[in-house]
Amino acid sequence: MHCSLNGDWSMQLNSTEISDLIKQRIESFEVVSEARNEGTIVSVSDGIIRIHGLADVMQGEMIELPGGRYALALNLERDSVGAVVMGPYADLKEGMKVTGTGRILEVPVGPELLGRVVNTLGEPIDGKGPIEAKLTSPVEVIAPGVIDRKSVDQPVQTGYKSVDSMIPIGRGQRELVIGDRQTGKTAMAIDAIINQKNSGIFSIYVAIGQKASTIANVVRKLEEHGALANTIVVVASASESAALQYLAPYAGCAMGEYFRDRGEDALIVYDDLSKQAVAYRQISLLLKRPPGREAFPGDVFYLHSRLLERAARVNEEYVERFTNGEVKGKTGSLTALPIIETQAGDVSAFVPTNVISITDGQIFLQTELFNAGVRPAVDPGISVSRVGGSAQTKIIKKLSGGIRTALAAYRELAAFAQFSSDLDEATKKQLDHGQKVTELMKQKQYAPMSVFDQALVIFAAERGYLDDVELNKVLDFEAALLSYARGQYAELAAEIDKSGAYNDEIEAQLKKLTDDFKATQTW
């Protein structure tokens, strides 16, 4: 090898010298270990931390912070990681060391959580001691595929006449409850949970961004009505960080999936997803993701679709495969009742339209109806159930066919009747019937009705037994009829509650019951 230096002299290097030089270099080389799952906080602001050095972190990974807290990795950038702190962040400082755990966020699941109030991470906040859950589950799970699903054909009774007759809900369905503030959305969901206390359906109530006093009231009501024992309450109140409010629905869903995947039935209420979307928008803007319509990030549709797709009815093969053959021949279901709050009845805003398009129907609650004393304030005109019809109890399905038609005709005629004074007999009769059906659909809170009670009341309305009852006496008539039936026809009531069947014999018995009651004139 020939090297020319300064052009005036040259030196020769032989192969031995070269190999010695290389050996020398190798011996003097220092190995500096680079911790790929350890990083340093470079900035802290508004619950968002930027971390330098976490090379091997995954999307959604738990990052351990000083003091036993965690952050969630959401932005994986070229030279830094953006993570959102779950919990208080005031004492975090630049330069602090953090560690990647290699785990996605998991929450405890199982029957041990029933009857308890927990936070987003599954930690008890009801002061009743620790929860000895044996299993945990990731909060983000891919929803069951098409092959694993089964069609919806079993009912979830809400206990509301208006819902069970016109907008029936099936096990594994997603039914949106939508309306302005103070229209009875939470009341409807809580009543649906109370009605499941003897149905074998487990319930999960997820409170997102609500006042702590409101949540305490809900828990007390569930306890008073004996429904807390088979309910899990997941709380991310208004005072919690945006990260916990964003994650709460997924945590609640993971707890519900435990029952679904083992051949049980569960009902989950998200109260409400508008607040979750706002929390997610806050996180996204702080992470400097580009805003879109109404300043929401581009993936706000996916935020809700991946959550609501996990509510499903799964078939026997899926359950058997999931439980390794322990549970055979049983289907499982998770029914979702997401709640969305609208502003001044605007259902065409971004988040409401998204959730309407994801769900299998919606129950629309109207402020005008609520203020007029029609409670629950269900608007039968724009409320639908896209898959619940095949899940409806046979007797309710047979009897309630005319209810929606009667109310639709009544609404049309009522608008017309305002401008016309001389109405013919048929129109007057239709208006009168519509008014009485509207009156009959009213129901008090915390008073869910059994299948028999609903069937009997609808039977009386449909067969003209209310025609000679004054409008202001309709609810008295209903109460007296039910009390009479429970006393005199207890066997029939038990049979209908159990089977939900409808045939000529049952029809004859209902007719005899109502005729006997009308003869007493005791309302």
Curated annotation (Swiss-Prot):
Subunit structure and binding partners: F-type ATPases have 2 components, CF(1) - the catalytic core - and CF(0) - the membrane proton channel. CF(1) has five subunits: alpha(3), beta(3), gamma(1), delta(1), epsilon(1). CF(0) has three main subunits: a(1), b(2) and c(9-12). The alpha and beta chains form an alternating ring which encloses part of the gamma chain. CF(1) is attached to CF(0) by a central stalk formed by the gamma and epsilon chains, while a peripheral stalk is formed by the delta and b chains.
Tell me the GO molecular function terms. ADP binding; ATP binding; proton-transporting ATP synthase activity, rotational mechanism
Pfam family name, one: ATP-synt_ab_N
Task: Offer a single GO CC term for the protein.
Answer: plasma membrane
Report the NCBIfam families cross-referenced here: atpA, PRK13343.1
Q: Could you say which protein family the record assigns here?
A: Belongs to the ATPase alpha/beta chains family.
Please name the source species: Vibrio parahaemolyticus serotype O3:K6 (strain RIMD 2210633)
Q: Tell me the enzyme class.
A: translocase
For this protein, the record's InterPro entries field holds: ATP_synth_asu-like_sf (IPR023366), ATP_synth_asu_C (IPR000793), ATP_synth_asu_C_sf (IPR038376), ATP_synth_F1_a_nt-bd_dom (IPR033732), ATP_synth_F1_asu (IPR005294), ATPase_a/bsu_AS (IPR020003), ATPase_F1/V1/A1_a/bsu_N (IPR004100), ATPase_F1/V1/A1_a/bsu_N_sf (IPR036121)
Which protein, by its recorded name, is this?
ATP synthase subunit alpha
Report the main location listed first in the record. membrane
Q: Where in the cell is it found?
A: Cell inner membrane
Task: List residue numbers at the site (Required for activity).
Answer: 383
Q: Where does ATP bind?
A: 179-186
* Topology versus the membrane: Peripheral membrane protein
